[in-house]
Amino acid sequence: MAVVAHNEKEVSLLARLMRAEAEGDGQLGMLMVGNVGINRVLANCLDFTNITSIQQMVFQSPGGFEATQYPYFYQAAREVDIRLAQRVIRGEKFHPASYALYFYNPFDQGCRAQWFGQWNSGRYKSHCFYAPTQSENCFR
């Protein structure tokens, strides 16, 4: 069962985003980026209070994903990418991105303790992930 409402176009958007942001980190890295995207749709805090769909999340501006600014994002989603997107839409979570709202690539500088006021929840390959504290009440 899906944790967010979606249509076929939005599954493809999420799949393309996951690939464009994290293909170099393999399928698990792509799933973690997908977690961040779905978390932003589910979150009721920070810059995400008015984000209610995958489409809004992918193209949020300001504060959205850098990958949408590059041609690679606009390639068709592959079947494997679509299957990965469907997994996170169904609610599968992958630590350290389980509740993360942000991630970034530190380019081997190490993960900062905080990013946009969120605490580091861990690193996977080239990406550092950042999640809100429970006291921020981001998730219903």
Segments (PLM) and residue ranges:
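Bacterial extracytoplasmic/cell-wall-associated proteins, especially those involved in peptidoglycan
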Residues: 2-140
